[in-house]
Amino acid sequence: MDLKSGYPFWSIRNGLMRAYPRLEQDTVCEVAIVGGGVTAALIAHELLRHGHEVVVIEQRDIGWGSTSASTALLQYEIDTPMIELAKQHGMQAAALAYGACAQAILDLQGLCNTFGGTDFTRQDSLYYASRPRDIKDLRSELEARKAHKLPVEWIEREPLWHNYGVHSDGAILSRLAASVDPYRLCYRLFSECEQYGARIHDRTAIASIEPHEPHVDLRTEDGVGVRARHVILAAGYGNQRWLSQPVARNRSSYAFVTDPLHDSDMGALKHTMMWETARPYLYVRSTPDGRVVAGGEDDNIDIPARRDARVQSKLRTLLKKIGKTMPDMRLRPAFAWAGTFAETADGLPFFGPHAELGPRVSFAMAYGGNGITYSAIGAGLLRAQLESTPHPLSGLFGFSRLG
């Protein structure tokens, strides 16, 4: 299925950076990773660095699915606020999830610094109240984060307008966030993976998965066989095709990017990404070359033709919302696009085996607005499971939480 509409900026900016060979003959490996986006790349890189043998199989070109349509906001702030997550799983679990996401940003920073070329940029994150009635819960969210040592402060209405150009009654300012070019990150990771000995194949679709002991047999649509000791399904929202019941719902999100702006026009966006308490939320961030990326207006459409038809009307709505909240921001879109993604009921990901496919097949479902951050956590979690070592998030980020 086509995962995106319009012209995602990252694929236009970077082009097709590298073609990998199709898988054309039977192969045997320790770990087969199905998927070729940034989630698969982070997992492959983690496994290879720790001595595992990896084959990567992607049905499209590498990075050409949801990765190319991502706006790549790297936040510890989960789509579900900490106080709401605590109601579902308890405050200890909520704090564990938020803390792991905070550490993941630092881990991603270290990783990107080792090979460069990803446009990784540390930023602040401004989470502002969409309506006056949101202030009470936003204050409670601030106190919950402070209690667990997260770097946050409160911004009142006047300094919010004076320093950030945002009309709102209050906001949480977080000092730990970042942005990245997801497409470049994906390719840089896979380039590193090749140096560790990975075999990477694109334009190769998997038609069947047959778990056995002590291996798993995969078969491509062209009839080529792959026998692996372990399989990791990291194919984005398409992972759900392998389960009889969905564990997440598919949605579409809409975004645009401007031409480069002068520094004087960028204002606080140069160093601060901004998003709101409303759901679905509006978000705005900058790129290192002075562009503004904005998006939101999520809906339940995942039929490509219907999603395609909505891109321009969603663009107009996004511009109207930005104009209302940030009236000094004059934005002229250069490209607009939409992408299909999935989200879970509690905003948390799923990493690990599912009873339907047994212990040798693991899922990597980094769903929600924290996809790249979740993937960085999931890479370590899946390695721990592969090596039969405990991980503090195996339960919370596993299918067992579904009951």
Region spans (language model):
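Glycine-rich FAD pyrophosphate-binding loop
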Residues: 49-69
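C-terminal catalytic lobe of FAD-dependent flavoproteins
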Residues: 308, 323-403
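Flavin-dependent oxidoreductases
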Residues: 208-287
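N-terminal Rossmann-like FAD-binding beta1-loop-alpha1 element of flavoenzymes
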Residues: 29-56
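Flavin (FAD/FMN) cofactor-binding and adjacent substrate-gating region
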Residues: 2-13, 80-85, 110-188
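Helical element adjacent to the flavin cofactor pocket in flavoenzyme catalytic cores
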Residues: 144, 171-222, 226-229
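Glycine-rich active-site loop/strand segments that organize a redox cofactor
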Residues: 69-100
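Extreme N-terminal leader/targeting segments of oxidoreductases
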Residues: 1-31
